[in-house]
Amino acid sequence: MTTQGITVLGIDPGSRTTGWGIVREVSGVLTLVDCGAVRPRGDEFSDRLGAIYHGLHEVIARHMPDEASVENVFTAKNAASALKLGQARGAAVAACAAHHLPVASYAPTEIKKTIVGVGRAEKEQVSFMVARLLGVKGDWGPDTGDALAAAICHLNMRRLRRLAAG
């Protein structure tokens, strides 16, 4: 960590929409750097995975974060959905790896509990708290809100690990 603090890219993977958000922490103060979503077009699944990879690759090259935090895949409506979600997550992690970015993974319930205090919080509650923590108006979509939550969760967990280490 430099005197400029640490910058974390949070990612909420999805085959239709992959949210991303970049949060910087300096002396315990969180600042929103940028956020958005990669929305692949087309029916060919491999093309969508490529779009996720390239979209995040561009975000990382533009903002040069120090670390990344990616929401883990635990549940889906069915096995096929879980597989697609896992592949989208793989494309996101590969984009981070191409930039030698350390990647942390957190379960959705862990992220929600860190941000809202409840592991089963609704997406709207998460977005509301993310906006409050960042001191901004939260006019992003749910995927971007979840990505920002993943970044904040990682910053909080990092701080706790440093405190525990003494």
Curated annotation (Swiss-Prot):
It is found in: Cytoplasm. Mg(2+) 1 binds at residues 12, 143. InterPro entries: RNaseH-like_sf, RNaseH_sf, X-over_junc_endoDNase_RuvC. Its cofactor is Mg(2+). GO terms for biological process: DNA recombination; DNA repair. One of its GO terms (molecular function) is DNA binding. Its EC number is 3.1.21.10. It catalyses: Endonucleolytic cleavage at a junction such as a reciprocal single-stranded crossover between two homologous DNA duplexes (Holliday junction). Pfam families: RuvC. Its main location: cytoplasm. GO terms for cellular component: cytoplasm; Holliday junction resolvase complex. The active site is at 12, 71, 143. It comes from the Bacteria. The keyword DNA damage applies. Keywords: Cytoplasm, DNA damage, DNA recombination, DNA repair, DNA-binding, Endonuclease, Hydrolase, Magnesium, Metal-binding, Nuclease. Homodimer which binds Holliday junction (HJ) DNA. The HJ becomes 2-fold symmetrical on binding to RuvC with unstacked arms; it has a different conformation from HJ DNA in complex with RuvA. In the full resolvosome a probable DNA-RuvA(4)-RuvB(12)-RuvC(2) complex forms which resolves the HJ. The RuvA-RuvB-RuvC complex processes Holliday junction (HJ) DNA during genetic recombination and DNA repair. Endonuclease that resolves HJ intermediates. Cleaves cruciform DNA by making single-stranded nicks across the HJ at symmetrical positions within the homologous arms, yielding a 5'-phosphate and a 3'-hydroxyl group; requires a central core of homology in the junction. The consensus cleavage sequence is 5'-(A/T)TT(C/G)-3'. Cleavage occurs on the 3'-side of the TT dinucleotide at the point of strand exchange. Belongs to the RuvC family. This is Crossover junction endodeoxyribonuclease RuvC. It comes from Oleidesulfovibrio alaskensis (strain ATCC BAA-1058 / DSM 17464 / G20) (Desulfovibrio alaskensis).
